[in-house]
Amino acid sequence: MSVGILGTKLGMTQIFDEAGVAIPVTVIQAGPCTVTQVKTKQTDGYFAIQVGFGEVKPKALNRPLLGHLAKSSAPALRHLNEYHTDSSSDYALGQQIKADIFSEGQIVDVVGTSIGRGFAGNQKRNNFGRGPMSHGSKNHRAPGSIGAGTTPGRVYPGKRMAGRLGGKRITIRKLTIVRVDAERNLLLIKGAIPGKPGALVSVVPAKVVG
């Protein structure tokens, strides 16, 4: 598995290809990330690197985390993430990982947190149909039956009902990188990704099978 990168979602826009066709893209501020730990098979049982992103004031972090970051001479970083690799020999503590590790046309997966929409009903959360809106009906947006009677005498686990919508970890797979701005560390990815502008995202090379 190749190394990914942490970044923030900046928003969406559109660019035009050679034929003049508009392509909707999401702009991601990708890195720069600092390698804060290198894991090897001898010391940890597997190969991986840990990267940090999002510089903050030192007082925002606790002392154990500041001590961990000091080993790589990294500044105070808010977010840490680990990426598995086939070999960690190509990476060193304090190394910078930037947007240029990706290329145009590359297929990637984007991991983020979906926008939280609070408590939502069945129509919005589960795409249920509604009841009649006229002719004396009082069942407009009610959930309807949630089970039988005495048997089974309970509501089955997993029954789709009203509840909190969004705010969950989401992975959007097999998106295409349309453009890489190595100078400004920007990635332009075709399509939408989870989260609102400013949200933390992780971009990793996709596992394309076949």
UniProtKB/Swiss-Prot annotation:
> What job does this protein perform?
One of the primary rRNA binding proteins, it binds directly near the 3'-end of the 23S rRNA, where it nucleates assembly of the 50S subunit.
Q: Which Pfam families match?
A: Ribosomal_L3 (PF00297)
Q: Which GO terms describe its biological process?
A: translation
The UniProt keyword set, sorted, is:
Ribonucleoprotein, Ribosomal protein, RNA-binding, rRNA-binding
Task: Identify the GO cellular component terms for this protein.
Answer: cytosolic large ribosomal subunit
Describe its assembly: Part of the 50S ribosomal subunit. Forms a cluster with proteins L14 and L19.
Identification of the protein by name: Large ribosomal subunit protein uL3
One GO molecular function term of this record is: structural constituent of ribosome
What InterPro entries does its record include? Ribosomal_uL3 (IPR000597), Ribosomal_uL3_bac/org-type (IPR019927), Ribosomal_uL3_CS (IPR019926), Transl_B-barrel_sf (IPR009000)
Q: Where is this region: Disordered?
A: 122-155
Q: Spell out the family assignment given in the record's similarity comment.
A: Belongs to the universal ribosomal protein uL3 family.
